[in-house]
């Protein structure tokens, strides 16, 4: 555990250390003003900031700045020169020799040797043919041949490979030299950074209802219009970085610079991003820099014949739970590789930012395994923190926001590390948002362990509002994690097997389906309205996609049955899925109009345990939820900050959302100067059971 500096030790030492930290970190005073409880850890922020600044300075002195340093992909790998020749470069510090082989030389392993340079680098120039044509044409198969110090001959894919494919029944991927005559020309500029972030988490491969791997083209033509129609302004693309094992959900990366070929070509991914931009939708990449696949024949592992090339050697270089390799973030060339990878996806594919996967694993030497984070600040400082990894994340955020000031970075961190989403100038991590990972766990816990009448309103509100001041959160009721095999989506927890038999509008509501549809809407709206400064939905869950996600693997006889999204269910007018889809669409459109995600955190005026009522105000709107399974309330008094006439702008009980139409939308609700629940005004409202309402004060300017 950390040993914080405390005034009790020697007051003069404490003050001196605090003043030194404030002098070194430009805006640390602001961070400590926001959260005075961080004062004992000022020296930790000082050390982290100085380490970040020193590496940035070293990069400037030795590489000409981070701009040049992050362009590694322009020289490493294999490149066509202006004269038609080929320039090749690799970093393989443990190799005895490096060679290039492939179709072009009949797979002779040793006819094209690289020349050894300083610092473990190797380079090769191959002149063009006599007729000036390229010796290695577009589409050629290549391999780097490594001779190890122990005498082994190893066939490897360049870590900088831009395209790899697996042909037929081959176990391993092949490296394809991707050098098309014409590159994709982007037609549309990046959209402006949205004031409110409404994210549609997507996986290209499962985006079809057919039992197959869907394509970039399919996603562009069929899924993008749905996302636009639903009112989402951001797509988060999973499983794009190449991964040999499809069932890893894209989290065991083998080729970091290659867009997955199982969905199509690099140009087709570029077209997908470009088309999204034309719709005003920004696109984030789910980037995996927390670990890498153990594959060596088609991955980074043992690239130069040693276990310490890109990774820590020994036990520190392996994540036992994930069975994967862990980067040595203090290594100069690994920093070049990872920062260049960030830049590659920003510039080559025009992604608008990143969701960083596995940040908790990066931040701590214990990787978060077996750790129940209590929120005690000592858990976030001291020897358990991997400050090399934290410094890399600061560098990555610095690079992203320098290259594209409007870009967005999101941290997947379950630990709740303070200041992770504070500016680097304050000593923070520099992320724009963090995922509010406790929220989906709370909903699943309630559905699994509690009867509806035992739901604790205060507990729900606490989970939805428990976030650090001025560190923005992405709220979500469920993501891909909750849909994976072994778990269930919210809809399946609520309705289970009845989704197969009782979702037709031609049959009466059963109690299970009625409860499921009403609570599904309420859970999503209260998460959207109260839970954060951004909102995320995993594809298909907007309409209550049945079942779970399970990728083809030996354990399910390589079946694609659960690795698809049945969008046709919401297009069928005779099925009730359309009601949930309609509600999701109108919830997003209303947020676009009023911007509650960009507004200050809500004021919760009521969380009544007996009545099961939650009421709060945000962005000038009054949100009211009645979670009681059977009780409706006539003339229920709800507090409000400002006087005026109120009208219903969203009603989960409306017919188009599969509700029971118990509310008259022509009704006007007038406030009176009657103080209630700490609010100076209040109004009387009819609140049916299992209903969520949003009221607008029409006397206020919109």
Swiss-Prot record:
It is linked to Glycogen storage disease 4: A metabolic disorder characterized by the accumulation of an amylopectin-like polysaccharide. The typical clinical manifestation is liver disease of childhood, progressing to lethal hepatic cirrhosis. Most children with this condition die before two years of age. However, the liver disease is not always progressive. No treatment apart from liver transplantation has been found to prevent progression of the disease. There is also a neuromuscular form of glycogen storage disease type 4 that varies in onset (perinatal, congenital, juvenile, or adult) and severity. This is 1,4-alpha-glucan-branching enzyme. Belongs to the glycosyl hydrolase 13 family. GlgB subfamily. CDD domains: AmyAc_bac_euk_BE, E_set_GBE_euk_N. Disulfide bonds: none annotated. InterPro entries: A-amylase/branching_C, Branching_enzy, Glyco_hydro_13_cat_dom, Glyco_hydro_13_N, Glyco_hydro_b, Glycoside_hydrolase_SF, Ig-like_fold, Ig_E-set. It catalyses: Transfers a segment of a (1->4)-alpha-D-glucan chain to a primary hydroxy group in a similar glucan chain. It comes from Homo sapiens (Human). The active site is at 357 (nucleophile), 412 (proton donor). Binds its carbohydrate substrate close to the active site, but also via regions close to the N-terminus; this may result in increased affinity and therefore increased catalytic efficiency. Substrate binds at residues 62-63, 91-93, 118-121, 333-336.
